[in-house]
Design a protein with these regions (language model features):
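ATP-binding N-terminal substructure of ATP-dependent carboxylate-amine bond-forming enzymes
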Residues: 1-97, 101-103, 107, 114, ...
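Glycine-rich phosphate-binding loop of ATP-grasp-fold ATP-dependent ligases
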Residues: 19, 139-163
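Short, surface-exposed amphipathic charged segments that create phosphate/polyanion-binding patches used
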Residues: 110, 135-138
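A structure-centric signal for secondary-structure junctions around beta-strands
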Residues: 2, 119, 136-137, 150
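Flexible, glycine/proline-enriched loop segments at strand-loop-helix junctions
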Residues: 95-99, 122-125, 150-160
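Anionic group-transfer/hydrolysis microenvironments
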Residues: 70-73, 123, 145, 157
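Basic phosphate/pyrophosphate-binding loop/patch that engages nucleotide-derived ligands
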Residues: 111-119
């Protein structure tokens, strides 16, 4: 009997299209003689197709394991992992807490540094605050604290207006 793998793709984040590409690669790489792949697409507006995964034990009898290929908010941030925990469904990847912590770049850098891992110099910019230039000079890479897949990254060669 084949293992029934639900691959979650799409989602409501700005990384929807990236998720679709990731899921396509995952599904193409799975051995069809061992796995029955069931694609679950979450639209940009949040509608599930073919149907939602129900957050209750035994509410998803046709799924053996879930492979979340979602990116960003509601995908990598612990949200969908929490839903899968409530649904009592095994899934691939990190759990709720690990997913949540790793989505926050500032927190993750602090955790890594506290554990003795090398971390490049950085500074946190908060909207509405006026800051001086970084002590480590230019160029710098600017990245949103809670997005993944390189979304929103820019390389600044000259000091931008700090906002």
């Amino acid at each position: 009997m084949k293992l029934r793998v639900a691959v979650l793709q799409g989602g409501r984040s700005g990384e929807h299209e990236i998720s679709l590409r990731s899921a396509k690669s995952i599904m193409e790489a799975m051995d069809a003689s061992r796995y029955e792949v069931i694609p679950y697409t979450i639209g940009k507006e949040g509608k599930w197709s073919p149907r939602p995964i129900l957050p209750e034990p035994d509410g998803n009898p046709d799924i053996d394991v879930v492979f979340p290929a979602l990116h960003g908010t509601f995908g990598e941030d612990g949200t969908v992992q929490g839903l899968l925990e409530l649904a009592d469904l095994p899934y691939v990847g990190a759990g709720v807490l690990s997913s949540s912590l790793s989505m926050d770049k500032e927190l993750m850098k602090r955790i890594c540094r506290e554990r003795g891992l090398p971390v490049v110099e950085y500074m946190i910019l908060h909207r509405g605050l006026t800051l001086g230039p970084p002590s480590f000079g230019f160029p710098v890479f600017v990245k949103p604290a809670n997005l993944g897949s390189s979304v929103g990254i820019s390389k600044e060669r000259l000091p931008p207006r700090w906002r």
